[in-house]
């Protein structure tokens, strides 16, 4: 259905360089204005990988896009910011600082939130996106008309009919009392709410799982400067939190990024629905996006 506005893109170029979370290597991202109808896509070594659920593959602790042997990891925070800030069309050029990594690159983590991307988008601004002939396109949005849900290993993700975008998210970490059980519900969900309540929430982990994750080759670039760490016995190791329920809010940030992969041809990625998730993760988010995609 029509949203009542035309598709948008960036008013200028954005360039940011930083360390990645899992590989620990440095990469540079350049965001370029895109043509109307192109949507969001990555350009890695002249290989185009659309930011689409069709190219999402399961990977530990992040969302990865794969096409023709090339992989781009930890795309969720960047895509979350682009979706929430209504950047419908964008060319995302990304490159490694290490020339030996010719088939894999990871988006920088910065402080573990989407704040760096949101600030950059606000600084450069937005403009109406047009195609190569100068024509603008209507921004469309999918509406959920019948409930859909998926369950997996005690987790659930669902989408219910709603006149507006709403998100309800719950998490449970009984092994870490400082986190415990948290729930966040937003109505309605829009760019203003995202900027003030979601974008600055940082990724988090349990201290007792750090060694295990590093033995698996993960979070090599992780530290107290790019995430919040909670100990089961000692609580938060690098307070203060930005919100009392910052872990739950970060899960919403991830969800927006993962559901943005539902977008097609510059349309809205988040479907107009009440999205409800409990104990979710990137794989479950992607499964919900695939289920929604298969229903249209």
Where are these regions (language model features)?
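Short acidic-hydrophobic catalytic motif
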Residues: 1-296
């Amino acid at each position: 259905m029509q949203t009542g506005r035309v598709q948008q893109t960036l008013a200028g170029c954005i360039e940011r360089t930083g360390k990645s979370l899992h590989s620990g290597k440095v990469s540079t991202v350049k965001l370029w204005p895109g043509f109307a109808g192109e949507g969001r896509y990555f350009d890695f070594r002249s290989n185009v990988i659309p930011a689409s659920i069709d190219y999402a593959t399961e990977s530990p602790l992040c969302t990865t896009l794969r096409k023709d042997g090339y992989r781009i990891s930890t795309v969720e925070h960047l895509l979350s910011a682009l979706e929430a800030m209504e950047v419908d069309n964008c060319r995302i050029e990304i490159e490694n600082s290490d020339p030996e990594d010719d088939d894999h690159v990871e988006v920088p983590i910065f402080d573990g939130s989407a704040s760096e991307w949101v600030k950059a988008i606000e600084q450069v601004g937005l403009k109406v996106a047009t195609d190569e002939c100068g024509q603008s396109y209507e921004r469309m949005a999918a509406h959920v008309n019948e409930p859909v849900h998926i369950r997996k290993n005690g987790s659930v993700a669902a989408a219910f009919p709603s006149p507006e975008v709403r998100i309800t998210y719950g998490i449970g970490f009984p092994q870490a009392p400082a986190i415990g059980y948290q729930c966040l519900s937003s109505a309605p969900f829009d760019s203003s709410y995202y900027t003030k309540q979601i974008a600055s929430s940082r990724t988090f982990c349990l201290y007792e799982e750090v060694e295990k994750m590093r033995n698996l080759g993960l979070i090599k670039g992780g530290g107290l400067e790019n995430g919040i760490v909670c100990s089961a016995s000692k609580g938060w190791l690098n307070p203060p939190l930005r919100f009392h329920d910052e872990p739950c809010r970060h899960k919403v940030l991830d969800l927006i990024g993962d559901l943005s992969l539902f977008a097609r041809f510059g349309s809205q990625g988040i479907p107009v629905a009440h999205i409800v998730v409990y104990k979710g993760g990137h794989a479950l988010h992607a499964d919900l996006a695939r289920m929604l995609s298969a229903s249209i």
